[in-house]
Amino acid sequence: MTWFESIILGLVQGLTEFLPISSSAHLRLTAVAAGWRDPGAAFTAVTQIGTETAVLVYFRKDIVRIVTAWTRSLVHKEARGNIDAKMGWLVIIGSVPIGVLGLTLKDYIEGPFRDLRLIACTLIGLAVLLALADRFAARNAERAESVGRHRADRPVKELDDLTVRDGLIYGFCQALALIPGVSRSGATITGGLFLRYSRAAAARYSFLLAIPAVLASGAYELTEIGEPGSHVDWGPTILATLVAGVVGYAVIAWFMRFITTRSFMPFVIYRIALGSTVLALVWFGVLDPFAGGVHE
């Protein structure tokens, strides 16, 4: 990998990680479009450490509060009812599905799942679900304005309404992102909207939930890369990770403002257009579905 490639791929990772359009799909497609070798699942996992560092910085106050409350809940029973302590436990619970499935499906993630036809189909499929969830959320918001904000009857939920059941559902939605094209934020936000959480609450928990999974995945890939016989261009990879982190922070700040007043339809349209284009190019033989594959 050249330094130029690493900068471009870092920009792509940072721009797409937190938007519901799939960073892994865009890294794969960028490499194909430029005629580069597929950077692979390991590169994606390591560069995601950069974007998750952006999450740690952006949500630092929330994270410090949650970690502090969760730690206290381990020692003091009375602290277990604290909302932040509860959030800590729910982030852990929601991280279990992707941890188990990530290890179980590792060979598929690094191989068959990177087929451009599958990526195109998941781009389109999740777009349809996101559109339905967005419309569902809009109707719930309208109902919320008419019935008031009393907990007993409010149709829109916030983070303090999270339950173990909801946390697990979020977790399984996150696990779908093991397939390039799904999008971690897209899947979890879609799940959250269907569970009747507000757009802001769905996005915030989505970003917090990703922290353990992404950092663990990146650390695991770092140990794998360090095995004898493995090869990695450390300089370009580190540069891509730094670029992804800086750009990712700016994207989080923009996205959290965007979703408070706008719908997800621009992302839905983009996903369908991109997925349809990739399918057409593969269908007409312009693109090889395994072009630039890591196993070539």
Model regions and ranges:
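Multi-pass membrane proteins that catalyze or facilitate reactions on polyprenyl-/lipid-phosphate substrates
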Residues: 1-296
